Amino acid sequence: MSNKDINIIFFGNTDFSNPTLLACKKKFNLKAVVTNKSKKMGRGQKILDTPVMTLAKKENLKIIEGEDLSDASFIDQLKDLNPDFFVVVAYRILPKSLLDIPKYGSINIHSSLLPKYRGAAPIQHALLNQEDSTGVSTFLIEPKVDTGKIIDQLKIVITKDDNYGSLSKKLSEAGAGLIESSINKCLHHSSELTEQNNSMATLAPKISKEDLKINWNDKSDIILAQVKAFSPTPGAFTTINSKRLKIFKAESINNDNNHEIGSIYNVDKNFSTFNVVKMH
């Protein structure tokens, strides 16, 4: 079976999904793209597509809006396409009724070296924990979240300048680079897939609003990591004069002028830059 004989249905929503979508289009017979339905957003209630839908339209791909994943007509649509694989990147948890459809299984690209950082926010948690490296994993999806057999992994170094945006871009491109070999490994060398060691698993739960709030009593390195983990979106924040202020970049500097601990100085008129004095 050549690559172009392999039928793929792609599932994704975000910018992180798009490099793998393009790789699937280039390498395989991409039958359809499943993404969330367009929604009205903002004060003007403008209809916004997911980044995946925007790209799929540009590439003239068949789009299926996955609103109710248990809907019988939706399931029948997928079955009629006779997929060999589902490829899932930054989408939703697929129910077993969908996982049973593809002939050879469903492959997910996860932005950590599983079993480390299972869950919704692996990139953010790697940065919050000040890791010096992370990576991407391809694995076969099973009903439990992020627990399936590992197909392949690639380690990525986290640099001192990385934030969520830059690291996400690196990982999304790395994951796209693994998809061709991962599909072929499932087809021809499935015995080489590796069971995850559940005793080594760590979790990366969804980020809450409380996680975004800076505690100025924390050590400087913790605050710097927090800013990186949430930049450029959704943004770590603090409150000054009862107003919420998002912080997208920070650095540690010496308090050469002996400003009082807790003081804020060197503030420009738009609060786009300022200094905060901390004890450590």
PLM feature segments, named:
Residues 5, 26, 85-203, 210:
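Donor/substrate-binding cores of folate-linked one-carbon enzymes
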Residues 205-218:
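Acyl-group handling in specialized metabolite and lipid biosynthesis
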Residues 217-280:
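An anion-binding loop in the catalytic cleft
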Residues 1-44:
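N-terminal Rossmann-like dinucleotide-binding module
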Residues 13-16, 67-70, 90-93, 230, ...:
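Short beta->alpha connector loops
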Residues 36, 40-84:
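N-terminal glycine-/serine-/threonine-rich beta1-alpha1-beta2 phosphate-ribose binding loop
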